Structures are given as C-alpha cells and as structure tokens.
Swiss-Prot record:
Protein name: Translation machinery-associated protein 7
Region (Disordered): 1-64
Gene name of the encoded protein: tma7
Pfam families in alphabetical order: TMA7
InterPro entries, per database record: TMA7
Membrane-spanning ranges: none
Species lineage: Eukaryota, Metazoa, Chordata, Craniata, Vertebrata
Similarity comment text for this entry: Belongs to the TMA7 family.
Domain of life: Eukaryota
Keywords: Coiled coil
Coiled-coil regions listed: 21-50
Naturally occurring in which organism (per UniProt): Danio rerio
Sequence ranges of Gly residues compositional bias: 52-64
Keyword Transmembrane helix tagged: no
Amino acid sequence: MSGREGGKKKPLKAPKKQSKEMDEDEMAFKQKQKEDQKAMEQLKAKAAGKGPLTGGGIKKSGKK
C-alpha cells in the first residue's frame, strides 16, 4: 500500500435495494396509515379554528 492509495475501499453509500413486491397485509397497512393521517389532518384543521381550550372561570391576580 503506497501513500496515494489510502482511505476507504468501500463506497460511502450502500447501493439502493430493489423495491420488493408488497403483499396484501402491507398494502392494507399502508392504506390504513394514509387514512389515519388524513383523519388527523382534518381534526387539526377543525381544532385550529377554535380558540384556546382554557380561559373560562375566575382569574386570580396573584396578589395577596
């Protein structure tokens, strides 16, 4: 090994794996995840229109 041939012999990035065929369980799981994400975004949008949750009741000044 001479001085010019130092360093890593392996490439830094591993080659990408080929996309495998998904079976029925994986397809159903991915579909369920997409539906859950859509539902969460709808709930977030609905909740964003409302004001803060707290704010009712008697406010105390903190003075004694």
